[in-house]
């Protein structure tokens, strides 16, 4: 034994506390733990002299006071070899169901530490055990530590059929089914396009049915109140409608609320990976089983979607339209004092907000407690750079009323000093639209108290400098004549009759307005797009107007003038009917 101890001690530079027998070994390799050290940390070579000494002189079934046996140790070894295990069995190792102080038998450690579960090794470790009723958490152990990778279904089914309890929970309250739902999401994401058979989720559905047949509680809740359906729908990956249906058909309750007061449907609608067909499936299933959702519930779903889903891609707009239509939510309808547009701007969801403005939501409508969208942005302390959000609002230009523009004068002091880029654009547009903006500033400049309030955020000097530059450019804009008006008026009105003049100015490299060049480009592009839409509508009208129509008595310029006043939304609706949303840009 001394030779074994010396060889192992010379090779060890650190001994984990777990191998210390309550201090008896005083941090050293001893005859009590040398066998455990060897099997835990050495690359065991069955032909080596040391291995032969260990087999001959060591008690291969000895347990330390922590409960660890040599078999526990070897199945944890990252250089585990099945051939060594077979030799250990041949030499009398038999403590397959002995537990360490954590309640783990050797099989626990093999399931946790093995990179790939070998079926033959698994059988060697499980066959001597009649059933797993005394180690009922084996299935949970395997899924908890391996849910991120490829699972071995032979292992899953054997653990389940030999008595591992599917309702065991970890310290967070997660059951085997919770972890399996996590596995499906993670593994589905990386394998979705690899094979057609995988996308049908046959193995996954079969195991869900089997684990429930063996007693798994489909509605077991974690410490934060999540059911397996909550858990599956919360994952930020692609979701399979087949898995959702498997859970629903076996009794998943869509009414259960977690500690955040969210049902599975609510959790799903908060997910950026939400898709329309699964959402429709969930809503239809819920209504068939528990009754029609009330409008208030529909409002809440829409609120959650806007708050948490940033509206990237056409699928997000499809879901937005679906919710608006399904629950018949009107443009001036409030939920908790706000319309959907207020919610969008309050949560910096510019994509959704832009679409809502496009379909006719009024950007100037106040909340029920008389707040503007500007107020909502400035009150939200989670918005670090509020000028960017305000710029997104005034980017809608003429849809923002003059009183709203005027109100921004009193909000300037709340801009962050790091928002120079957007602050310049905001002030430039305010001065263009509101002729009194500069006058107010000049008047307040005489008041020292006015200057001092800027100290907390953006400096007064910076604001003053921007306003002076804007005034200089405004005077130059007024000097440039365009037909019967000037460039200043064209930018204020965006009359598409002057689009060709604006295009010429935009393309002229010799003409520059540092504070307004970007706005000129935006107006030019907007007017070009609007002009093309108007032309398409007029062409369509020409093909449908006959001699009996009242429109046929109107001069073409009058018809054009009427059509020009329509919004892009109405023009697209005239052109494409119900498919107009496909042409939203």
UniProtKB/Swiss-Prot annotation:
Belongs to the orthopoxvirus OPG003 family. One of its GO terms (cellular component) is host cell nucleus. Residues 554-571 are annotated as: PRANC/F-box-like. ANK repeats lie at residues 66-98, 172-220, 224-256, 297-333, 336-365. This is Ankyrin repeat protein OPG003. Signal peptide: none annotated. May be involved in virus-host protein interaction through the ankyrin repeats and PRANC regions. It comes from the Viruses. Ankyrin repeats may mediate protein-protein interactions. Disulfide bonds: none annotated. The keyword Repeat applies.
């Amino acid at each position: 034994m001394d030779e074994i101890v010396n060889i192992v001690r010379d090779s060890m530079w650190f001994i984990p506390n777990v191998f210390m027998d309550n201090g008896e070994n005083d941090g050293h390799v001893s005859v009590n733990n040398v066998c455990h050290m060897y099997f835990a940390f050495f690359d065991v070579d069955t032909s080596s002299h040391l291995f032969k000494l260990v087999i001959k002189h060591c008690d291969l079934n000895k347990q330390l006071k922590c409960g660890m046996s040599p078999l526990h140790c070897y199945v944890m070894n990252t250089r585990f070899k099945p051939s060594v295990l077979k030799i250990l069995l041949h030499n009398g190792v038999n403590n397959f169901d002995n537990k360490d102080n954590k309640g783990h038998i050797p099989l626990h450690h093999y399931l946790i530490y093995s990179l790939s579960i070998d079926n033959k090794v698994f059988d060697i470790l499980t066959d001597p055990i009649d059933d797993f009723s005394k180690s009922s958490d084996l299935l949970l152990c395997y899924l908890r530590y391996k849910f991120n990778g490829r699972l071995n279904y032979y292992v899953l089914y054997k653990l389940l059929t030999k008595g591992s309890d599917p309702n065991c929970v970890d310290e967070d309250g997660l059951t085997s089914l919770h972890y399996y739902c996590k596995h499906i999401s993670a593994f589905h994401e990386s394998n979705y396009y690899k094979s057609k058979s995988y996308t049908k989720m046959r193995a996954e559905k079969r195991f869900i049915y089997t684990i429930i047949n063996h007693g798994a509680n489909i509605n077991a809740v974690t410490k934060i109140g999540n059911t397996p359906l909550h858990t599956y729908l919360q994952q930020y990956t692609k979701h399979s409608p087949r898995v959702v249906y498997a859970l629903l058909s076996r009794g998943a309750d869509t009414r259960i609320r977690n500690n955040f007061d969210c049902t599975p449907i609510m959790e799903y609608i908060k997910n950026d990976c939400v898709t329309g067909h699964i959402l429709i499936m969930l809503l239809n299933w819920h209504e068939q089983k528990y009754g029609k959702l009330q409008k208030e519930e529909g409002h809440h779903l829409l609120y959650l979607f806007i708050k948490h889903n940033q509206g990237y891609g056409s699928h997000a707009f499809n879901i937005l339209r679906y919710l608006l239509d399904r629950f018949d939510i009107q443009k001036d309808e409030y939920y908790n004092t706000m319309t959907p547009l207020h919610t969008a701007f309050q949560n910096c969801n510019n994509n959704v907000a832009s679409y809502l403005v496009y379909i006719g939501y009024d950007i100037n409508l106040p909340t029920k407690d008389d707040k503007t969208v500007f107020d909502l942005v400035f009150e939200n302390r989670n918005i670090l750079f509020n000028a960017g959000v305000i710029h997104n609002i005034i980017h809608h230009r003429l849809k923002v009323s003059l009183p709203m523009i005027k109100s921004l004068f009193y909000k300037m002091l709340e801009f962050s000093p790091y928002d120079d880029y957007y602050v310049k654009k905001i002030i430039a547009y305010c001065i263009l639209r509101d002729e009194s903006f500069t006058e107010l500033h000049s008047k307040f400049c005489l008041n020292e108290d006015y200057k001092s309030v800027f100290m907390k955020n953006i400096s007064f000097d910076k604001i003053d400098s921007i306003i002076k530059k804007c005034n200089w450019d405004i005077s130059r804009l007024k000097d440039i004549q365009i037909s019967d008006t000037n460039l200043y008026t064209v930018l204020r009105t965006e009359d598409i009759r002057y689009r060709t003049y604006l295009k010429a100015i935009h393309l002229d490299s010799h003409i520059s307005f540092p504070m307004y060049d970007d706005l000129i480009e935006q107006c030019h592009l907007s007017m070009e797009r609007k002009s093309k839409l108007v032309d398409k509508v007029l062409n369509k009208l020409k093909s449908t107007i006959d001699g009996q129509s009242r429109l046929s008595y109107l001069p073409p310029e009058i018809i054009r003038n009427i059509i020009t006043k329509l919004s892009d939304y109405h023009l697209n609706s005239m052109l494409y009917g119900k498919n107009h949303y496909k042409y939203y840009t």
